[in-house]
Regions:
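N-terminal secretory signal peptides
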Residues: 1-11, 22
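C-terminal segment of N-terminal export signals and the immediately downstream linker at the start
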Residues: 28-63, 68
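Mid-length scaffold segments of soluble, non-membrane domains
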Residues: 76-107
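Residues immediately within or flanking Cys/His clusters that coordinate Zn2+
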Residues: 82, 128-130, 153
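Short cysteine-rich clusters marking metal-coordination/redox-active sites
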Residues: 85, 133-136
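Cys/His-coordinated zinc-binding microdomains
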Residues: 89, 137, 157-160
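Short, non-ligating residues that shape and space the ligands of small metal-coordination modules
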Residues: 94-95, 142-143, 165
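Short linker/helix segments within small regulatory modules
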Residues: 146-151
Length: 167
């Protein structure tokens, strides 16, 4: 009987562990989608976003996926100009604030004032700062504290979320 009890206890612990992990995965789902309807001035329905964006753009900008490093042509672009949100065309970053972070994503040490919103991102068992367009809520990337002065910030941005306009 002791062996059966021990197996049941082990099975119960294993089940509790699986349920805990499942709860964390559900909790890690994008929060921005829930907040969009009331938070951002520019709004579209899910079907309108899908019509406006390619499937990959939709995955990154509306579902917080990440493009592979070194795949965006904007990563190596250093022409003078402005980077806009692909979702709503709001100005987000100036080329003056772009730098080569070596990470494989377009990186900026400063955004255009008021153009980028942030929130805590607790996915993948860590806390990061997610950044999004303040006008439409489209996911841009994350902000880290390892950038150059004067801000010390690195806005690590998915190039697929941006459109570049030459000055």
């Amino acid at each position: 009987m002791a062996k059966v009890y021990g197996k049941r206890l082990f099975m119960n612990r294993r089940m509790l562990f699986k349920l805990s992990i499942a709860g964390l995965v559900v909790r890690a789902q994008p929060i921005a989608a829930k907040e969009e309807a009331s938070e951002f001035p520019f709004q579209l329905s899910k079907s309108e976003w899908k019509a406006r964006l390619t499937p990959f753009e939709f995955a990154v900008m509306r579902e917080e996926a990440t493009e592979r490093a070194f795949t965006s042509p904007l990563n190596s672009n250093y022409e003078n100009g402005t980077y806009h949100c692909k979702g709503c065309d709001q100005e987000l970053y100036r080329s003056l604030h772009k730098f080569d972070s070596g990470t494989g994503w377009p990186s900026f040490w400063k955004e255009i004032d008021g153009a980028v919103g942030t929130r805590k991102d607790r996915k993948f068992f860590m806390i990061r700062t997610e950044c999004h367009c303040s006008n439409c809520g489209s996911h841009l990337g994350h902000i880290f504290d390892d950038g150059p002065q004067p801000t010390g910030k690195r806005h690590c941005i998915n190039g697929v979320s941006l459109v570049f306009y030459k000055a």
